[in-house]
A protein has these predicted regions:
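Short aromatic-hydrophobic micro-motifs that form the base-stacking/packing surface
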Residues: 112-116
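Conserved core of the sugar-phosphate nucleotidyltransferase
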Residues: 109, 123-209
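Acidic metal-phosphate-binding loop of nucleotide-sugar-dependent transferases
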Residues: 91, 118-122
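N-terminal glycine-rich phosphate-binding loop and ensuing alpha1 helix
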Residues: 2-67, 81
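Acidic helix N-cap motif at the loop->helix transition within catalytic regions
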Residues: 67-73
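Short active-site oxyanion
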Residues: 54-58, 82, 140, 190-193
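Residues at secondary-structure transition points
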Residues: 28-31, 36, 40, 85-93, ...
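Short phosphate-binding loop-to-helix
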Residues: 74-111
């Protein structure tokens, strides 16, 4: 038993950063609202998370000026569906602001937060359940990942092939990424304050050493 769980049963919360604007792709509409099979992409994502019974709630972090979500998912907000327009200038800032929102809504340091990208609509509820099972008794947490299948090449300074990278023990990080709130929040804050480039939650935790 670790220090987070003494006498307290931790809850699981999903946090979905959904504040992207589509600026990197040049799209007129953010990719999370692109239509897929008759629904906005993010709707499929949230439907999958809704099938995970162990999630106490799912918090969607939107840009302050988002004017698409309410029309796209009019029935989402409720007891297990939370929305906060606290998105930041980067994904990491949006997640950090979302963590603060969870605290404001009563989440405790021992609770688990599963951060999942809004655009990853193919996530399966059973995969999320397996992640929760795998991390429930862990001190730190974990993430979904796939073993690398492609051949990787190392480039030199002139963008010429310098060698082949061994794929042994190499994995492609996926989401959700599951960490305790009391660990992830200070890890992400420290990385942002230090100007460290954070590409996912695991990299923030790794930066703690």
């Amino acid at each position: 038993m670790n220090s987070y769980t003494v006498g307290v049963e931790p809850r699981c919360f999903a946090l979905v950063p959904c504040a992207g604007t589509g600026s990197r792709s040049g799209a007129l509409t953010a990719k999370q609202y692109a239509p897929v099979a008759g629904q906005p992409l993010v709707a499929h994502t949230l439907q999958a998370l809704a099938r995970v019974d162990r999630l106490a709630a799912t918090l969607v972090v939107l840009a302050p000026d988002d004017d698409h979500f309410d029309d796209a998912l009019p029935g989402f907000a409720g007891a297990r569906g939370w929305v906060a327009r606290v998105g930041g200038a980067s994904r990491a800032e949006s997640v950090a602001n979302g963590l603060a929102e969870l605290v404001a809504r009563g989440a405790q340091p021992q609770d688990w937060v599963l951060v999942h990208d809004a655009a990853r609509c193919l996530v399966r509820a059973d995969a999320v359940d397996r992640l929760i099972d795998a991390c429930a008794n862990d001190e730190v947490g974990g993430l979904l990942a796939l073993p690398l299948a492609d051949t990787l090449k190392q480039a030199d300074g002139q963008d010429r092939v310098a060698g082949t990278v061994d794929r042994e023990a190499k994995w492609a990080a996926q989401t959700p990424q599951m960490f305790r709130l009391g660990l992830l929040q200070p890890a992400l804050r420290a990385a942002l304050d230090a100007g460290v480039t954070i590409t996912d939650e695991a990299s923030a935790v790794e930066a703690l050493g």
